[in-house]
Regions:
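Extracellular glycan-interaction surfaces
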Residues: 1-63, 71, 150-209
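Extracellular beta-strand elements of beta-rich domains used
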Residues: 40, 74-78, 119, 235-240
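Aromatic-rich beta-strand patches that line glycan-recognition/binding surfaces
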Residues: 53-59, 129-144, 164-166, 197, ...
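Extracellular glycan-interaction patches encoded by glycine-rich segments
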Residues: 54-68, 213-240
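Extended recognition patches within non-cytosolic domains
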Residues: 78-111, 128-129, 236-254
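Short surface loop/edge beta-strand patches of beta-sandwich-type extracellular domains
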Residues: 98-115, 140, 169-175
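A carbohydrate-recognition surface predominantly in extracellular/luminal proteins
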Residues: 109-125, 146-148, 179-185, 235-238
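Beta-strand-rich, repetitive solenoid scaffolds
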Residues: 137-138, 147-153, 162-165, 184-186, ...
Length: 254
């Protein structure tokens, strides 16, 4: 088909092959880190049943590879379309997994109320990809002690941020359409619970939750490694306070 050759020094792109006219490519360099970000797209035509892709190292035109030449490669996360997956560093053997989940022991991180959780979330979708994409939840807890922070959907709002803990289900419907936000939940000493998203705070209701056993775990980004309730997005600056933050503190936004 065709190739897009990128000069890593000048960032010049040269298209070759029979499909060169159908290839578009772009490249930029992050001067702070030295990484070069490259992207190439080919326009398919009728009759092409399969199109593969690969990354190759090539010496400069007219030159040759010499001892000591090397290049670092990092594959991107593919998080849109029917081929959603996340590639991971795996040594010399290629590997992929359906769901990137961070699992954290709850021991010494969270036990009882009051507490507040805040994090930055970027969801890479506009329509919920499953029943309830998780920002985080818990596993291995005792009956009635589950904690959930994620996104839900209804007839009127698709993708609203919400929390669910001990029968207290709090939503911020107004921010259902946001792709990036600071979101979280707060549980006070008197069990009053609310959800927060980018400066909006839901009304409060009482939870029956009081504590969680120390053998439980916190799961960030999904529910199972099989992809159940996978977020299909990014979570960063995940923070837990062992106190109820004020409305002003909970009202962070990005």
């Amino acid at each position: 088909l065709g190739d897009a050759y990128i000069d890593t020094q000048t960032l010049e792109i040269n298209m070759t092959g029979g499909a060169a006219s159908r290839i578009t490519a772009r490249v930029r360099k992050d001067e702070a880190t030295g990484w070069i970000f490259a992207e190439a797209t080919i326009q398919a035509i009728d009759g092409e049943l399969k199109i593969g892709s690969q990354i190759q190292y090539s010496p400069k035109q007219g030159g040759a590879t010499v001892s000591g030449d090397y290049i670092y490669l990092a594959t991107p996360q593919v998080e849109n379309g029917p081929c959603v997956s996340s590639f991971i560093i795996s040594g010399t053997t290629a590997a992929t997994r359906a769901s990137d989940i961070v699992t954290v022991p709850i021991k010494n991180n969270l036990y009882n109320l009051p507490f507040t959780v805040l994090c930055e979330v970027h969801k890479n979708w506009y329509k919920t990809p499953n029943a309830a994409p998780r920002v985080f939840d818990t596993g291995g807890h005792q009956t009635g002690a589950a904690i959930i922070l994620g996104f839900g959907s209804s007839a009127d709002y698709d993708g609203f941020p919400y929390c669910d803990i001990g029968g207290a289900n709090r939503r911020v419907n107004e921010n259902a359409s946001l792709e990036k936000m600071v979101m979280g939940m707060r549980v006070k000493s008197d069990q009053s619970t609310c959800s927060a998203s980018n400066g909006r705070i839901s009304s409060e209701t009482k939870t029956t939750w009081s504590c969680i056993q120390n053998t439980a775990i916190i799961r960030i980004g999904g529910q199972t490694t099989a992809g159940l309730r996978h977020l299909f997005g990014h979570v960063r600056n995940f923070r837990i306070w062992h106190k109820a933050l004020t409305d002003a503190q909970v009202g962070e936004s990005i």
